[in-house]
């Protein structure tokens, strides 16, 4: 049986050993729900990795958004280089759901752009679950949305062995049945081509490799794996399993049954409209559905096939859909990261989906069975949990109520303590903050400032810019990739101060940040609740000089609770440090691009050890940077722009480290 092999250059420290032991024991005793209450920067991901390695179960990790899922996936891949760590998020770069607005008689057709890279990763994830047990899938909440029947997906796979008797025509028919497209010129993912007795297939779950099946008569003579770009042979295989190119692929018999079932529902629905005199709706539904049926008959696929998923999988009306969770074996482990955000998200998915579809069904754009192409309801999601660990610095009411064990991880491995929190009056707050910023910039540290309104954030950014501060404003219109670049530039010192409204969003745990300023801290609301304030305070917890200033004229109940909880943790941490003679150190974290988490192959970069850099003489350091600069220019000349950009960032980071050391 495959085991998880955890690779790390460090061992559990602080509260990690206790948390790992308690959570592992809880899982082995069969506890269904546990919570890891881990403060920011306490190494919760490393604790999770150790628990996964100990219990050795296939694991689903659910994160609240794509960016956080990408970060977690990158970290788990570093911890488990020999195991299958997969990424499963919504494959839409852009998604406009199908909708109808009766007030203006406006039909909005579904419009989307599918990210081929993410679609490949989704196929890779489901294929891994059928091929091995040492699998970790990091997913967003999209994992509770409908997917094809896992049993059908497994049964439809094309299995080819060397020496097997398999007619050429039978292989080709099978490939078409499982939604592979024949294309003699363009061999890309989900396509195949034929040259005499040689069949070349690019499996849906592969990145840059394809499979060549060589036949001798009806016997499989050789199976080769080759590079799709260069044609170079990578190796010879004894067996290959090619999974369907679509999660909604279905067998001929089931497709016929599904079409019959769709036709019956259509007849019934047309009667319903005609009896009520809704002839326009009846005509619309008939035209659209008959077209879809024709497409299903001819090519086994149609745009919006997911709306017929109930018929294709043979489910009864109202029955929950199959989801990624159904692809896992029964004894799997679930970890819900940032559970205080993720659980409410899961809870709200069904209602949002239902309300949008009601108009589509009522006005004849879709059959009522479209309601069954939906995310899981919360009670259905609960029923699919085998064992779960909720992970959060501020667990929500659901986790606190249902967990059979709550494990605290307060002590950080670095010895860092929670930041000191100070409340200052709002009068003269901007000038006071400017003085604090100047201090931090002089020490090569960074500052986060959170405001309550867009106008305040914009005005503050403009004012600081006029005062000569290198400042950026992080607003909600910025897309995910641009956010990642802004955060990277903040870490590299391209600018020093980041102003934003919601600093609770992902990726803002930056070790260079030594000051978090909270303006209007006494205005009660979502962003100034106890839980939000504790999360915001945690943004300064990765730096040894971490400090939080709340600007407020009164101390609200939320502020007091957040300050009290921070002081409780701070006291425990300081006592532990005193007892064990630990001197806190700022977290040392490489500026790694989280965008790379979703790429299977990244540019090869030299692994740089900080202590190695600091021991270099000025001359050695200069020569090393010159070498990297040459490599960067060569990469740019060879059109390897990603590698060149990564080398550029590495050079900036190294120079910054050397400057700090001086």
From Swiss-Prot:
<dbReference type="Pfam" id="PF17757">
    <property type="entry name" value="UvrB_inter"/>
</dbReference>
<feature type="short sequence motif" description="Beta-hairpin">
    <location>
        <begin position="91"/>
        <end position="114"/>
    </location>
</feature>
<dbReference type="GO" id="GO:0005737">
    <property type="term" value="C:cytoplasm"/>
</dbReference>
<dbReference type="InterPro" id="IPR024759">
    <property type="entry name" value="UvrB_YAD/RRR_dom"/>
</dbReference>
<dbReference type="Pfam" id="PF00271">
    <property type="entry name" value="Helicase_C"/>
</dbReference>
<comment type="function">
    <text>The UvrABC repair system catalyzes the recognition and processing of DNA lesions. A damage recognition complex composed of 2 UvrA and 2 UvrB subunits scans DNA for abnormalities. Upon binding of the UvrA(2)B(2) complex to a putative damaged site, the DNA wraps around one UvrB monomer. DNA wrap is dependent on ATP binding by UvrB and probably causes local melting of the DNA helix, facilitating insertion of UvrB beta-hairpin between the DNA strands. Then UvrB probes one DNA strand for the presence of a lesion.</text>
</comment>
<protein>
    <recommendedName>
        <fullName>UvrABC system protein B</fullName>
    </recommendedName>
</protein>
<dbReference type="InterPro" id="IPR001650">
    <property type="entry name" value="Helicase_C-like"/>
</dbReference>
<feature type="binding site">
    <location>
        <begin position="38"/>
        <end position="45"/>
    </location>
    <ligand>
        <name>ATP</name>
    </ligand>
</feature>
<dbReference type="GO" id="GO:0003677">
    <property type="term" value="F:DNA binding"/>
</dbReference>
<dbReference type="GO" id="GO:0005524">
    <property type="term" value="F:ATP binding"/>
</dbReference>
<dbReference type="InterPro" id="IPR004807">
    <property type="entry name" value="UvrB"/>
</dbReference>
<dbReference type="InterPro" id="IPR001943">
    <property type="entry name" value="UVR_dom"/>
</dbReference>
<dbReference type="InterPro" id="IPR014001">
    <property type="entry name" value="Helicase_ATP-bd"/>
</dbReference>
<feature type="domain" description="UVR">
    <location>
        <begin position="622"/>
        <end position="657"/>
    </location>
</feature>
<dbReference type="GO" id="GO:0009381">
    <property type="term" value="F:excinuclease ABC activity"/>
</dbReference>
<keyword id="KW-0227">DNA damage</keyword>
<keyword id="KW-0547">Nucleotide-binding</keyword>
<dbReference type="GO" id="GO:0016887">
    <property type="term" value="F:ATP hydrolysis activity"/>
</dbReference>
<dbReference type="GO" id="GO:0006289">
    <property type="term" value="P:nucleotide-excision repair"/>
</dbReference>
<keyword id="KW-0228">DNA excision</keyword>
<dbReference type="InterPro" id="IPR006935">
    <property type="entry name" value="Helicase/UvrB_N"/>
</dbReference>
<feature type="domain" description="Helicase C-terminal">
    <location>
        <begin position="429"/>
        <end position="595"/>
    </location>
</feature>
<comment type="subunit">
    <text>Forms a heterotetramer with UvrA during the search for lesions. Interacts with UvrC in an incision complex.</text>
</comment>
<dbReference type="GO" id="GO:0009380">
    <property type="term" value="C:excinuclease repair complex"/>
</dbReference>
<comment type="similarity">
    <text>Belongs to the UvrB family.</text>
</comment>
<dbReference type="GO" id="GO:0009432">
    <property type="term" value="P:SOS response"/>
</dbReference>
<dbReference type="InterPro" id="IPR027417">
    <property type="entry name" value="P-loop_NTPase"/>
</dbReference>
<dbReference type="Pfam" id="PF02151">
    <property type="entry name" value="UVR"/>
</dbReference>
<dbReference type="Pfam" id="PF04851">
    <property type="entry name" value="ResIII"/>
</dbReference>
<dbReference type="InterPro" id="IPR041471">
    <property type="entry name" value="UvrB_inter"/>
</dbReference>
<keyword id="KW-0267">Excision nuclease</keyword>
<keyword id="KW-0963">Cytoplasm</keyword>
<dbReference type="InterPro" id="IPR036876">
    <property type="entry name" value="UVR_dom_sf"/>
</dbReference>
<keyword id="KW-0067">ATP-binding</keyword>
<dbReference type="Pfam" id="PF12344">
    <property type="entry name" value="UvrB"/>
</dbReference>
<feature type="domain" description="Helicase ATP-binding">
    <location>
        <begin position="25"/>
        <end position="412"/>
    </location>
</feature>
<keyword id="KW-0742">SOS response</keyword>
<keyword id="KW-0234">DNA repair</keyword>
């Amino acid at each position: 049986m495959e085991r998880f092999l955890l690779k790390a250059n460090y061992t559990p420290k602080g509260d990690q050993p206790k948390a790992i032991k308690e959570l592992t024991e809880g899982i082995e005793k069969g506890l269904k729900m546990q919570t890891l209450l881990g403060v920011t920067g306490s190494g919760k991901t490393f604790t999770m990795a150790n628990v996964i390695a100990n219990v050795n179960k296939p694991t689903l990790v659910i994160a609240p958004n794509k960016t956080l899922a990408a970060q977690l996936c990158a970290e788990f891949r570093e911890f488990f280089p020999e195991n299958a760590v997969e990424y499963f998020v919504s494959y839409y770069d852009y998604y406009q759901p199908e909708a109808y607005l009766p007030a203006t008689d406006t039909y909005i057709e579904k419009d989307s752009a599918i990210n081929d890279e993410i679609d490949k990763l989704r196929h890779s994830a489901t294929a891994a679950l059928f091929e091995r047990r040492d699998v970790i899938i990091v997913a967003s909440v999209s994992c509770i949305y409908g997917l094809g029947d896992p049993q059908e997906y497994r049964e439809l796979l094309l299995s080819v062995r060397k020496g097997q008797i398999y007619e050429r025509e039978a292989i080709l028919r099978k490939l078409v049945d499982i939604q592979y497209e024949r294309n003699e010129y363009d061999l890309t993912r989900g396509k195949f081509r034929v040259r005499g007795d040689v069949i070349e297939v690019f499996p849906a779950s592969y990145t840059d490799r394809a499979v060549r099946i060589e036949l001798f008569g009806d016997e499989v003579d050789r199976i080769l794996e080759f590079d799709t770009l260069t044609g170079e042979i990578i190796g010879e295989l004894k067996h290959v399993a090619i999974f369907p190119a679509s999660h909604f692929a279905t067998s001929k018999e089931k497709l016929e049954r599904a079409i019959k079932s769709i036709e019956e529902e259509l007849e019934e629905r047309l009667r319903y409209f005609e009896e009520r005199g809704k002839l326009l709706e009846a005509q619309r539904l008939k035209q659209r559905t008959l077209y879809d049926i024709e497409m299903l008959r001819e090519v086994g696929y149609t745009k919006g096939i997911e709306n017929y998923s109930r018929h294709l999988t043979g489910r009864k009306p109202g029955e929950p859909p199959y989801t990624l969770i159904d692809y896992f074996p029964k004894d799997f482990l679930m970890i819900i990261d940032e559970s205080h955000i993720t659980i409410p998200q899961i809870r709200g998915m069904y209602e949002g989906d239902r309300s949008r579809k009601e108009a589509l069904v009522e006005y004849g754009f879709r059959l009522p069975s479209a309601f069954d192409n939906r995310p899981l309801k919360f009670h259905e999601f609960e029923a699919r949990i085998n064992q779960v660990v909720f992970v959060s610095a501020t667990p929500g009411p659901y986790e606190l109520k249902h967990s059979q064990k709550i494990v605290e991880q307060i002590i950080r491995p670095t010895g860092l303590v929670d930041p000191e929190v100070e409340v200052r009056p709002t009068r003269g707050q901007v000038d006071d903050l400017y003085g604090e910023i100047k201090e931090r910039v002089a020490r090569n540290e960074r500052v986060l400032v959170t405001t309550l309104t867009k106008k305040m954030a914009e005005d503050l950014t403009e004012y600081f810019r006029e005062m000569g501060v290198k400042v950026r404003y992080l607003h909600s219109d910025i897309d995910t990739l641009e956010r990642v670049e802004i955060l990277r530039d903040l870490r590299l010192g391209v600018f020093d101060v980041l102003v934003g409204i919601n600093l609770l969003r992902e990726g803002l745990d930056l070790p260079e940040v030594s000051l978090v300023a909270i303006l209007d801290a006494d205005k009660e609301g979502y962003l100034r609740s106890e839980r939000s304030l504790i999360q915001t305070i945690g943004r300064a917890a990765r730096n040894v000089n971490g400090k939080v200033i709340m600007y407020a004229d009164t101390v609200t109940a939320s502020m007091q609770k957040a300050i009290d909880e921070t002081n409780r943790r701070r006291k425990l941490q300081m006592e532990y440090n005193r007892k064990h003679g630990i001197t806190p150190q700022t977290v040392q974290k490489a500026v790694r691009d989280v965008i790379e988490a979703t790429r299977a192959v990244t540019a090869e970069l030299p692994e740089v050890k900080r202590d190695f850099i600091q021991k270099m003489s000025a001359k050695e350091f200069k020569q090393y940077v010159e070498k990297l600069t040459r490599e960067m220019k060569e990469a740019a000349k060879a059109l390897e722009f990603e590698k060149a950009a990564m080398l550029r960032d590495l050079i900036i980071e190294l120079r910054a480290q050397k400057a700090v050391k001086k």
